[in-house]
Structures are given as C-alpha cells and as structure tokens.
Design a protein with these regions (language model features):
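Conserved catalytic core of the tyrosine transesterase superfamily
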Residues: 1-301
Length: 301
C-alpha cells in the first residue's frame, strides 16, 4: 500500500471530518513521516499491510535509543493508532498492528506554579513601555492573565480582540472557540502594542507580530518567556505552560469557581482543571494553620 497517498488521505480526513487544528496536523504528519522513514531504513519498504507488532516494538526501541522522551514516544504511538484505525475504517487493512501495544509508563514531572510574589516582579510598566521589549513582556502578561496555550497566543487573530467588551476569542484544541475576559490593564497595553505593530500583508490578520512583520512562532514565544522569567525566578521550568498553570492556580486560590476556570482554560473535562486545586499545598497549610481552632491554639490531641 502506497504510504504517502494514505497519509495524505488520513490528514485530509482528520482536518475535514475531525476538524483538527493546523498544529495538530503538523504533529501527526511529523510522527507518521518518522515512522515511514524507519520502515524504509529497517524493512526496506513502506507497505502498511506488512507492518506487524514486532516492527512497532522495534520502532519504540529505536526511539528510545535516540533518547526520545517517553511522552513523545507515546504521542507517536497514538498517531499511529489513529492512522491504522482510519485504514481499518476505509477497509484497507483487516487488523491493526497497534492492537494490544501498550504505551510506555512514566511519571510526569510535577508542574510547580510561580508564586504571586514572583509574578509581581514581572509586570508591565504601562507608563514607560520600551518598544523593543513591549512585545515580549506583553506575551508573558497575556499568557499569565488569560491562561491561554502557547499555540492559542500565536494564532490569536486581530479581529478576535474586542477592546470594547474587554475580551478575546481564542481557538483551542479541536478548533473549539472560547471567550476569555481581559483586564483593563492588559487591554490598555494590548492597544498600545498596536501602535508599534507593523505586519506584512500576508500576516496582518494575526494580533502578535514579530519585528519583521511576520506571525510569531512557538520558538519565539518560548524564548521570550524563558528569558524574562529567568530574571525573577530560579525555577528550572520556565515555559509558557507554567504561566498557564500559574494562572489556574492563582484564580482558584482566590475563590474562582472551578467550573468557570474549566471554561476559560478550554478543558474538555473537569478532571483536567482539578489538577490545579492541589497545586499549592503550602497555601492550604497556611489556611489551616490560621483558621482551624486547634491549629491556632496548638492543642495537643
């Protein structure tokens, strides 16, 4: 079976029928092309029908030997599962070599949110914005004040920023749109940024534009966040996702309803949001020690 043709049919299917985002399509294409190259190098063919469980396991070993993270290996397996389910659906194969192939087990590193004190050091000076640094500082504030994902920030459209209503519309996973409120302070700085924003014609629809007039990429956002947060914290993890994590943790600590936070975060299930309720155990200890009668009086049991 011709691999390239079936790959394109599959990508068209998940784009049209499943309405997967462009970023998701890029990930699927990369994962499946990696497997295609592996087949060619180790089996001297790209026949999907001839792929069996042994080849899949060899692919996993190959990725492990290249020091690919377990999370990334599992993602590639997930892409292959979806691909073969599609081939089953259209009747091109009778069974999937991924059946009974287990994902790798791993312990995810605990995400530690930034404290309010750390974030207080990283605030925009509205009265004295520096032209060169305003974009990068605005990126950080937008991520922290809205909780949006890096890809959602990069793909934010100019027309989806409503200054009159104080809200933005972002397109999340599965091309699902959601409305997120923005503070007057953030709105003011975003409006100020528009005064120095000079996009190229091809990228004028995007809100965030780099100095060359082009749409931002993920690498630029990650670099901006890492550089600026290095000035205020010694934490090892300084990624855009940590700012999203910090947003959720802080608004929940201040009493926001978890169901409302779920909507803002764009989570499909409440379980994803509940992760953030246990993020700051020290805060819970402080509440207990200051509020519980026995903790306050240090009564022996």
């Amino acid at each position: 079976m011709f691999y390239t043709i079936m790959l394109e049919r599959f990508l068209e299917y998940i784009a049209v029928e499943k309405r997967y985002s462009p970023n998701t399509l890029i990930s699927y294409r990369k994962d499946l092309q990696d497997f295609s190259l592996f087949l060619l190098e180790t089996e001297a063919h790209q026949d999907l029908v001839k792929v069996d469980k042994k080849i899949i396991r060899n692919f996993m070993v190959h990725l492990g030997e290249k020091k690919i993270a377990k999370r990334s290996i599992n993602r590639k397996l997930s892409s292959l599962r979806s691909f073969y389910l599609f081939l089953l659906k259209v009747g091109d194969i009778k069974s999937s070599p991924l059946e009974n192939i287990q994902s790798l087990k791993f312990y995810a590193e605990k995400q530690i949110p930034f404290s309010e004190e750390e974030m207080a050091h990283q605030q925009l000076e509205i009265n004295k914005p520096l032209k060169k640094s305003l974009l990068k500082e605005l990126i950080i504030e937008t991520l922290y004040q809205t909780g949006i994902r890096r890809a959602e920030l990069v793909n934010l459209l100019l027309e989806n920023v409503d200054f009159s209503k104080g809200e933005i519309k972002v397109i999340g996973k599965g091309n699902k749109a959601r409305i997120i409120p923005i503070s007057k302070k953030l709105s003011s700085v975003m409006a100020e940024y528009l005064l120095i924003r000079k996009p190229l014609e091809a990228d004028k629809e995007y809100f965030f534009i780099n100095a060359k007039g082009k749409k931002l990429n993920d690498k630029f956002v990650y670099s901006a966040v890492n550089t600026y947060l290095s000035l205020v914290t010694s934490k090892k993890k300084k990624s855009p996702h940590i700012l999203r994590h910090s947003f959720a943790t802080h608004v929940l600590e201040y009493g926001a309803e978890i169901s409302k936070v779920k909507m803002i975060m764009g989570h499909s299930s409440l379980a994803s949001t509940q992760v953030y309720t246990s993020a700051n155990i020290e805060q819970l200890k402080k509440v207990f020690n200051s509020a519980h009668p026995r903790a306050k009086k240090n009564v022996d049991l």
